[in-house]
Regions:
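Conserved phosphate/metal-binding and DNA-contacting active-site motifs used
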Residues: 1-198
Length: 198
Protein backbone atom coordinates (compact mmCIF):
# COMPACT_ATOMS: atom_id res chain seq x y z
CA UNK A 1 0.00 0.00 0.00
CA UNK A 2 2.79 2.41 0.84
CA UNK A 3 4.35 1.79 -2.59
CA UNK A 4 1.02 2.46 -4.29
CA UNK A 5 0.47 5.70 -2.36
CA UNK A 6 4.03 6.85 -3.17
CA UNK A 7 3.55 5.98 -6.85
CA UNK A 8 0.45 8.18 -7.08
CA UNK A 9 2.07 11.09 -5.22
CA UNK A 10 5.40 11.01 -7.10
CA UNK A 11 4.19 10.54 -10.68
CA UNK A 12 6.59 11.70 -13.44
CA UNK A 13 5.86 12.25 -17.18
CA UNK A 14 6.69 9.29 -19.43
CA UNK A 15 5.94 8.17 -23.02
CA UNK A 16 2.48 6.73 -23.75
CA UNK A 17 2.32 2.89 -23.66
CA UNK A 18 -0.12 0.58 -25.41
CA UNK A 19 -3.28 0.05 -23.29
CA UNK A 20 -3.26 -3.13 -21.19
CA UNK A 21 -5.62 -5.95 -22.15
CA UNK A 22 -8.35 -6.89 -19.70
CA UNK A 23 -6.96 -8.98 -16.84
CA UNK A 24 -7.60 -12.71 -17.10
CA UNK A 25 -6.01 -13.64 -13.78
CA UNK A 26 -8.52 -11.81 -11.56
CA UNK A 27 -11.44 -13.98 -10.55
CA UNK A 28 -14.16 -11.52 -9.65
CA UNK A 29 -17.60 -11.70 -8.12
CA UNK A 30 -20.09 -10.34 -10.65
CA UNK A 31 -22.02 -7.45 -9.07
CA UNK A 32 -25.47 -7.90 -10.59
CA UNK A 33 -28.07 -10.33 -9.35
CA UNK A 34 -26.54 -10.64 -5.87
CA UNK A 35 -28.72 -10.73 -2.80
CA UNK A 36 -27.73 -7.88 -0.47
CA UNK A 37 -28.13 -10.11 2.58
CA UNK A 38 -25.78 -12.72 1.10
CA UNK A 39 -23.16 -10.05 0.34
CA UNK A 40 -23.43 -8.66 3.87
CA UNK A 41 -23.08 -12.17 5.29
CA UNK A 42 -20.01 -12.81 3.13
CA UNK A 43 -18.36 -9.55 4.25
CA UNK A 44 -19.18 -10.34 7.88
CA UNK A 45 -17.77 -13.87 7.56
CA UNK A 46 -14.50 -12.32 6.32
CA UNK A 47 -14.36 -10.19 9.47
CA UNK A 48 -15.33 -6.94 7.77
CA UNK A 49 -17.26 -4.19 9.52
CA UNK A 50 -18.96 -1.10 8.14
CA UNK A 51 -22.26 0.53 7.30
CA UNK A 52 -24.64 -0.29 4.44
CA UNK A 53 -26.94 2.54 3.39
CA UNK A 54 -29.31 3.44 0.53
CA UNK A 55 -28.11 5.29 -2.57
CA UNK A 56 -30.35 7.55 -4.69
CA UNK A 57 -30.51 4.96 -7.47
CA UNK A 58 -31.75 7.32 -10.19
CA UNK A 59 -30.50 10.05 -12.50
CA UNK A 60 -27.02 11.50 -12.79
CA UNK A 61 -26.52 11.13 -9.03
CA UNK A 62 -27.60 7.48 -8.82
CA UNK A 63 -24.47 6.60 -6.82
CA UNK A 64 -24.94 9.45 -4.32
CA UNK A 65 -26.10 8.63 -0.78
CA UNK A 66 -29.84 8.92 -0.13
CA UNK A 67 -29.06 9.56 3.56
CA UNK A 68 -26.54 11.78 5.36
CA UNK A 69 -23.12 10.33 4.51
CA UNK A 70 -21.12 11.57 7.51
CA UNK A 71 -22.88 9.29 10.05
CA UNK A 72 -22.35 6.30 7.73
CA UNK A 73 -18.63 7.07 7.53
CA UNK A 74 -18.06 8.00 11.18
CA UNK A 75 -20.44 5.76 13.16
CA UNK A 76 -18.41 2.76 14.35
CA UNK A 77 -19.85 -0.61 13.43
CA UNK A 78 -18.95 -3.88 15.12
CA UNK A 79 -20.41 -5.84 12.20
CA UNK A 80 -21.82 -5.11 8.73
CA UNK A 81 -24.66 -2.83 9.83
CA UNK A 82 -27.57 -2.49 7.38
CA UNK A 83 -29.36 0.89 7.51
CA UNK A 84 -31.66 0.13 4.56
CA UNK A 85 -35.25 -0.86 4.00
CA UNK A 86 -36.08 -3.76 1.70
CA UNK A 87 -36.75 -1.98 -1.57
CA UNK A 88 -33.64 0.10 -2.34
CA UNK A 89 -32.21 -0.98 -5.71
CA UNK A 90 -28.81 0.55 -4.93
CA UNK A 91 -26.81 0.46 -1.72
CA UNK A 92 -23.51 1.85 -0.60
CA UNK A 93 -20.96 0.23 1.71
CA UNK A 94 -18.77 2.42 3.92
CA UNK A 95 -16.04 0.20 5.36
CA UNK A 96 -14.97 0.82 8.94
CA UNK A 97 -11.48 2.14 9.73
CA UNK A 98 -8.87 -0.55 9.11
CA UNK A 99 -10.43 -1.58 5.80
CA UNK A 100 -10.36 -0.14 2.28
CA UNK A 101 -11.61 -0.78 -1.22
CA UNK A 102 -9.31 -0.11 -4.16
CA UNK A 103 -11.49 1.10 -7.03
CA UNK A 104 -9.92 0.35 -10.43
CA UNK A 105 -11.92 2.24 -13.03
CA UNK A 106 -12.33 2.19 -16.80
CA UNK A 107 -11.25 5.53 -18.35
CA UNK A 108 -14.06 7.52 -19.93
CA UNK A 109 -14.43 10.56 -22.18
CA UNK A 110 -11.12 12.01 -23.35
CA UNK A 111 -9.26 9.21 -21.55
CA UNK A 112 -11.10 6.36 -23.30
CA UNK A 113 -8.66 3.78 -24.69
CA UNK A 114 -5.93 4.54 -22.15
CA UNK A 115 -4.93 1.87 -19.61
CA UNK A 116 -7.60 1.18 -17.02
CA UNK A 117 -6.93 1.18 -13.27
CA UNK A 118 -5.80 -2.44 -13.31
CA UNK A 119 -3.47 -1.71 -16.23
CA UNK A 120 -1.97 1.24 -14.34
CA UNK A 121 -1.14 -0.99 -11.38
CA UNK A 122 0.32 -3.71 -13.62
CA UNK A 123 2.46 -1.22 -15.53
CA UNK A 124 3.70 0.35 -12.30
CA UNK A 125 4.98 -2.94 -10.92
CA UNK A 126 3.19 -2.27 -7.63
CA UNK A 127 0.84 -5.26 -8.02
CA UNK A 128 -2.43 -5.87 -6.23
CA UNK A 129 -1.35 -8.05 -3.32
CA UNK A 130 -3.96 -10.45 -1.98
CA UNK A 131 -7.39 -8.82 -1.73
CA UNK A 132 -10.00 -10.45 0.50
CA UNK A 133 -12.65 -9.99 -2.18
CA UNK A 134 -12.66 -8.88 -5.83
CA UNK A 135 -15.87 -7.51 -7.36
CA UNK A 136 -16.35 -6.67 -11.03
CA UNK A 137 -18.12 -3.29 -11.20
CA UNK A 138 -21.06 -2.48 -13.44
CA UNK A 139 -18.80 -0.32 -15.64
CA UNK A 140 -16.28 -3.14 -16.13
CA UNK A 141 -13.72 -2.07 -13.53
CA UNK A 142 -12.88 -3.77 -10.24
CA UNK A 143 -13.36 -3.19 -6.52
CA UNK A 144 -10.63 -4.93 -4.50
CA UNK A 145 -11.39 -5.24 -0.78
CA UNK A 146 -8.43 -5.11 1.64
CA UNK A 147 -7.74 -5.09 5.35
CA UNK A 148 -5.21 -2.30 6.01
CA UNK A 149 -2.16 -3.51 7.96
CA UNK A 150 -1.68 -1.91 11.39
CA UNK A 151 0.43 1.23 11.27
CA UNK A 152 -0.15 1.86 7.55
CA UNK A 153 -1.84 5.12 6.55
CA UNK A 154 -3.59 4.98 3.18
CA UNK A 155 -4.68 8.30 1.67
CA UNK A 156 -8.21 8.72 0.37
CA UNK A 157 -7.68 9.27 -3.39
CA UNK A 158 -10.35 10.05 -5.98
CA UNK A 159 -8.90 10.19 -9.50
CA UNK A 160 -5.91 12.12 -8.21
CA UNK A 161 -3.52 13.26 -10.88
CA UNK A 162 -5.71 14.94 -13.48
CA UNK A 163 -3.38 15.98 -16.33
CA UNK A 164 -0.47 14.41 -14.42
CA UNK A 165 0.92 11.21 -15.96
CA UNK A 166 2.21 8.27 -13.99
CA UNK A 167 5.59 6.81 -14.70
CA UNK A 168 5.42 5.01 -18.04
CA UNK A 169 1.77 5.90 -18.66
CA UNK A 170 -0.12 8.66 -20.51
CA UNK A 171 -1.63 11.71 -18.87
CA UNK A 172 -5.26 11.35 -17.83
CA UNK A 173 -7.45 14.41 -18.34
CA UNK A 174 -10.09 13.02 -15.97
CA UNK A 175 -7.55 11.76 -13.43
CA UNK A 176 -5.77 8.45 -12.99
CA UNK A 177 -8.47 5.72 -12.99
CA UNK A 178 -7.70 4.53 -9.46
CA UNK A 179 -9.53 5.54 -6.29
CA UNK A 180 -9.02 4.44 -2.71
CA UNK A 181 -12.14 4.16 -0.58
CA UNK A 182 -10.62 4.12 2.89
CA UNK A 183 -12.60 3.09 5.96
CA UNK A 184 -14.08 6.07 7.75
CA UNK A 185 -13.55 8.32 4.70
CA UNK A 186 -15.17 6.72 1.64
CA UNK A 187 -17.71 4.25 0.28
CA UNK A 188 -18.40 2.04 -2.73
CA UNK A 189 -21.52 0.87 -4.54
CA UNK A 190 -22.36 -2.49 -2.98
CA UNK A 191 -22.52 -5.68 -5.05
CA UNK A 192 -26.15 -6.49 -5.81
CA UNK A 193 -27.03 -2.89 -6.66
CA UNK A 194 -29.13 -2.36 -9.78
CA UNK A 195 -27.84 0.62 -11.76
CA UNK A 196 -30.42 2.73 -13.64
CA UNK A 197 -28.85 1.68 -16.97
CA UNK A 198 -29.01 -1.99 -16.01
Amino acid sequence: FANFAKLIRDAQPQPNPTPEPAPDELTALEPRGRDFGAVETQLGAMGWTGNVFPLRGQGDNAKAPAVALEPMLKTPATHVADHCGHDEPMRGFAPAPGFMVLDLDIPKGADEGKPDGYGVLRASGVGIGDPALVVRTGSGGYHLYYRIPDGVDIPQIAHKGASTPLSGLPAYEGGVPIDTRVGGRGFVVMPGSSMPDG
